[in-house]
């Protein structure tokens, strides 16, 4: 795969001290700790809004811009990958049923089931020699844009970076 085939700008909302340290180079990208919560909707990783600096700013007190190479991306806008996700869910469901355990559920802003299925799919793929470096997915959020609309006012695309080598550089976005 061409290393520079899918380059995008991503925006990460975070604490101001963290943003400053990263942008000034006082904190290396390799020291950036990925989120590993059991409810992270795209699984474990460092989360970015694709082309969404204002949304990142709404979420965190400061914003770090990043040039991202999606690399080998589990792109959930592609039916090839959503089909894999559906298959992985069925496999997990079978295991949980056989063990008499309830599957985790998504509740409100907690995406425990999504997190489990994506992390397991990435693990299964890795065992087969396919290493997903990033996960990308649209997130429909907010009220309808107008009455009867399927478009939501706060919809966005998020990226979870699992391989820090995909973060080519960081910058201070001009939010002016």
Model feature map: region roles:
Residues 61-65:
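Short, compact, well-ordered microdomains
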